[in-house]
Amino acid sequence: IKAKLTVGITPILAEQLNDEHLKHGFVKYLDSRIAQVTKDLERYPDPKVAHSQHLKYLAKYYFDWFNHIKDSFVNKYGMDLIGEFKKYQDLGCIEITTSGATHGFSPLLATDSNLNAQFKVGSDTTKRLFGRKAKGCWLPECAYRQGYEYVGKDGKKHWRPAIEVTLQNNDIEYFFTESHVIEGGNSIGNRRVIGVYGNIEYIPLPERPATGYDTYSAYWLPDAQVAVMGRNDRAGYQVWSAADG
């Protein structure tokens, strides 16, 4: 079944999955977990330990769990997850998107050359590992920056192009960003619920008025022939929220 799914694999993750040291290290990690739960299987049930029958059940559960993962990784996928993703990409089941090479926070990168390097190296990495250039991109941390005018060190005014111009220069046709960029409003509410930064207080920012757009559609941008889509709040909560996911 060709699911027609978009799968975002950042260049950093792709390089890690392709690294031989990491592959064999993962197998060693699984072996160590299996060895630990094997000891627990031998230890329980123990009449001197409360709830030891349940501890036996848990040990068996994790024994099966880690062995299943190892069997899949080693025997089913041949320790080559990149190859498996590429296979389903080539079959037309999935489309793999790229991202910044080192997950650099795009709006804070000091120069356009820094920004371009992030997405050029990221795009080249995706092509090298998966055999084709990505058409789409997940912005690191979904962080977007529009074009703006600034005063340079020379005292003159300069124009800094929006992020999508750099993406277009690297043959990227669409990208994903945060929901409030599309819909308006404030991003603080989302960040208090979504992700690892949920308990950090933020300095309140002026709330943008509602735009009338939603995250169920893609939109062409005026500065480049690139489309943008926003991360859907409801789907984001289901994935990231510790309370609602």
Residue spans for each PLM region:
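Carbohydrate-active enzymes and regulators
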Residues: I1-G245
